[in-house]
Amino acid sequence: MENTVKYRKFILPIVVGLIIWALTPFKPDALNDQAWYMFAIFVATIIACITQPMTIGAVSIIGFTIMVLVGIMDTKSAVEGFGNSSIWLIAMAFFISRGFVKTGLGRRIALQFVKLFGKKTLGLAYSLVGVDLILAPATPSNTARAGGIMFPIIKSLSESFGSTPKDGTERKMGAFLIFTEFQGNLITAAMFLTAMAGNPIAQSLAEKTAHVHITWMNWFVAAIVPGLISLIVVPFIIYKMYPPTVKETPNAKKWATEQLEEMGKISLAEKFMIGIFFVALILWITGSFINIDATLTAFIALSLLLLTGVLNWKDILNETGAWNTLVWFSVLVLMADQLNKLGFIPWLSKLIAHSLGGFSWPIVLVLLILFFFYSHYLFASATAHVSAMYAALLGVAVAAGAPPLFSALMLGFFGNLLASTTHYSSGPAPILYASGYVSQKRWWLMNLVLGIVYFIIWIGLGSLWMKLIGMM
C-alpha cells in the first residue's frame, strides 16, 4: 500500500483550526457559536489546501465531514451543496475542452496561427496568444489550455529553432514564448466567465453575497477592452524586458506546414467539434435573452459531443480534473455560503468597512484589489484564493458604497490576474516554469513589473470603459 499522505503538513491547519475553535468564548458578540465554528473549519481547510498534506479533493472531503459531524449542517442539506449549477458548469466545460485535445483541433488551430503569423518571434508570440483567446471561452481549465494544447506546440517550435534549456540556448526563443503564453493565458482567463474554473465560483459568490447577477455576456463586455489592450501591450513589454535572441523566424511557417501535413485533412470529429463549439458560444452570448443559462448550454454542448461520437462515456469518466474540481469546489463554496448565511461574512465586511470608513469607495476598492493580488503569494491556486477571499472582499466593497456589479466584476477579473505573481500561482505556472526556460528570479521580477501594468490597464482603463458602458 502506497501512503501518499504528508502528515506533517496537517500540523499547521490543525493547530490554527483548534486555536480559533478554542477562542469561541472570546468571539465577537455579533456572532453565534455556529458561525465561529464554521470559521475555524473553513480556515483550517483553506490552510490545508495551501500546505497540501493530501490532494485538495481529499482535504475538502475531510473538511466537509467535520462540518457535518459537529452539527453545522445536516447531511441532507450538506450533500445538496454538490448541486451548485456554477460548479457543474465548470465540470461540463472541462469535458468540452477534452474534445479540443482528443480531436486534435486545438493543435490544428495553433499550427494554422503559426503558419499565418509566425515570420517574426514577436508575431509568433501574438499568434500563440491568439489561439489561447479563441480556445478560452470553451476551456475552463486554463491549465489544460496552457499545458495540454499550447505548451507542446511552444516546446516543439522552440526546439526546432535550437532553443533548449539543456543547451543553454533558452533565450533564443523558448523563454520569451513560454513567459508570453503564461501571461496571455491569465489575460484570456480573465476575459470570459467560462475561461477559468474560479470565474463561475465568483459568479455564484457574487449572487449569494451581494445579490449581483453576473452573466456570460456582461462579464465578456466588461472585460473585452482591458483584455484586448493587455493582449496587445503585455507581449510587447515582455519582448522589450526579456527579448529573444532570435527575432526572425522564417522557418516557422515551413515547420507548421509540415506538422499540418502530418496531421492530414480535417477530420469529421474536428468538424463536429467546430460546429458544437460555435453552438455553445452563440448560446453563451444569447442565453440571457432566451432563458438558457450558461450551465444548460454546457450540458447541451456535451450532449451533442456524445451524440456525434466526438466523446464517449469513457472520456467523461477519465476526465479526472472535472470530477476532482466538482468535489472540492462544491465543498469550499458550500463552506463560504455557510459563513455568509451564519452571519460571519456580513460581520467581517462591516468591520473592515468601518475601519476604512474615512476613505471613499474607489480607494477602498483599490486597496482591496491590491490586498487580493499580493496575498496570492500565499496561495498555490487562483481558484482556491477566489473561494477563500472573494465573498468577504466583495462584501466590504459593497458596504463601503462601491457599485455592486462593478466591484464583483473587477474582483472577478483580478481573481485571474493575481496569478501573475509566482511560479506556483496557478495550474499553468508550474507546467510552464518546470520546462526550465525561465529562471525563478526572472519569473518573479517580470511578474512584479507586469502586476503594475495590469493595475494600470484593468483598474485605470477598465474602470473608464465600464463607466462608459454603464456598469459603474
Task: Please give the residue ranges for each predicted region.
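Flexible hinge motifs at transmembrane-helix junctions and intramembrane kinks/re-entrant loops
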Residues: P28-N32, W36, V43-I61, L231, ...
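Structural signature of hydrophobic alpha-helical transmembrane segments
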Residues: K27-A40, G83-F95, I292-L302, I352-V364, ...
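Short, amphipathic, aromatic/basic-enriched membrane-interface segments that mark the entry/exit
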Residues: E2-K6, P25-Q34, M54-A58, F113-T121, ...
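Transmembrane alpha-helix interface/packing and boundary motifs in multi-pass membrane proteins
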Residues: I46-T55, D132-S141, F182-L193, L283-F289, ...
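Membrane-interface helix termini and inter-helical loops of multi-pass transporters
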Residues: F26-N32, M73-G81, I109, E207-W216, ...
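Juxtamembrane and boundary regions of transmembrane helices in multi-pass small-molecule transporters
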Residues: M1-T24, N142-A146, F161-G264, F413-M472
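Membrane-embedded alpha-helical segments and adjacent helix-loop junctions characteristic
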Residues: G57-D167, E319, W323-T325, F329-A400
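Lipid-exposed faces of alpha-helical membrane segments in multi-pass integral membrane proteins
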Residues: L12-I19, A40-I47, I62, I66, ...
